[in-house]
Amino acid sequence: MAECLSKKIKQEETKLKKKNDTVSDIIYIIDKIREDNIMKYSCLEPYISSLIINIERGQLKLTKLEKQLTREEYLQLMSYIFYGCICITKETSTVAPTVENVDEKMHKRNFVKMNKWLTNLESFGNLSKQGDVYKGYFLGKEVVLKKPKKNFFLENTLKDYFNGIKCINSLRMECPMFAYTLGILTIETPSERKKLDEIWLVTEFIKGKTLKEMLKCNELSFKEFLDIFAQILVALEIGQNKYKFCHYDLHTDNVIIVPITNNYTCHVHVYDINVKTKFMPVMIDYGMSSSSLEKDISIGQHKIEDNGIFPYLFPGYDPYVFLLFCRDVSNVSIKSGINHLFKFYGDIDHIDYVSTLKNNTGRQTPLLFLEYIIKTYPQLSMDFTPRTIMTKSLLFKTPSMMMADLFLNPNEKESISSCFNNELNNGFIYFMLECTRNKLWFGKDKNMLTMSSYKKMISHDLKFLQKFISFVHEEKNNWSERIDDLQCAVNLLFLMKQLKIYDFKPYREWIDKFEASEMYSWYKSNKPYIDRCQRLK
């Protein structure tokens, strides 16, 4: 009797802890959403009047800048304009608004109707227990709107939005296999007693078929499936490395397959990966996902740990469970190929996936699986070459620059923040970075400084770089303890290659010396396993 009572008390304590953890997560999420809103509003504020006038007249065409921007920059611009539209619309609002929309005294007569910027809503996709999905047009561009049904899914929607703006959108800048989150808005709906505010999530529209549909209709060969899976591993590795991201709901309905005609490149570990496939997978629906923006803080689901879904990163979960889902709906050929892929995990039983994950399977990172595939399947439609890019988004236009281009002020320049720290601010690397971002280096202003100025900047960089050369010659036993410093040196290597300053002798000598060092060789071999240990903490 006492044992049963003790067990019941323990269960209640566990429930209470999960409830408290969920509340803490929501408070943290709301704070981060408010931070994002403040940042967006500060960028938009100078252009509010122009935004209202252009929308009222039907003159705001996002296509105006579409050809001048990368796809990722264009999506970022859309998200800022979307927030601006919410601010100037009385019948809707957003979560954690920074101001009461816009100052009503200033714009008393100038609020716009929502149907001026969000139109043609229609039901879209398959029926879902979680809620309804709609397709609509935001200023002429297709978007997806998700409306949750119950309180649990309302919590999921907030987490989906948080993961989107704080994690996924940043990953989308580096890798096209994530769907961009544009915004969240409240829509007032009448009920029997009172009007209720529903929270709707708005995301990028991905044009393609679900992986489930393609597998069921036998539209993929095993090689094409393998190319798709390898791309998903690349995306998951980028997500885990940057934000300890775990999708936790990566079934075949949550992967959209997009036909592509052009190659694209991603950057993982020490590789530039040139992808040359017919199909690109895009992962959607991040309400169940876990992510970590700050050390020792992880946001995720607290209520379904019995199903193997945790509020923190479980490195091997997504690839393994994804393959199980695919095997269930595949034809004989692909099913046989998936069984062969399972050899990566060794001789294990795949029936009870939760217990299997708790063993060796859950400890395997996407990068380790990807390297296994590279060795085992030479027919993979990817080229792996030495890495030359630190981060794609480094050279993208800022939202402020894009807003200035859109609203009447094309000459505004935006100062960029430091790449690493203040030690680089006065050097040639930082100068090149700022020139490239502001498109100054390629025109008539190329020789804007004197030779003595260039020499002074290069000298400043060399003093900073010399610290890392001395680090190279340290004892081998210290390398694992100084992995953060080593990662900084590797990032500098990729940055200098990205800025194409190899032709400058001082930088070329540093690059050659660093790449030839035993320490860099050690990094390439050991970093994946160090990452695995850190992700399992």
Curated annotation (Swiss-Prot):
Question: What Enzyme Commission number(s) appear in the record?
Answer: 2.7.-.-
Q: Which residues form the Protein kinase domain?
A: 119-429
InterPro entries reported in the protein's UniProt record: Kinase-like_dom_sf, Prot_kinase_dom
Query: Does the record's keyword annotation contain Transmembrane helix?
Result: no
- Annotated coiled-coil positions are 1-74
Q: Which residues form the active site?
A: 249 (proton acceptor)
- GO MF annotations in UniProt: ATP binding; histone H3T3 kinase activity
The record's section on Pfam families has: Haspin_kinase
Keyword ATP-binding present in the record's keywords: the answer is yes
Its protein name is Probable kinase 439L
Species whose genome carries this gene? Invertebrate iridescent virus 6
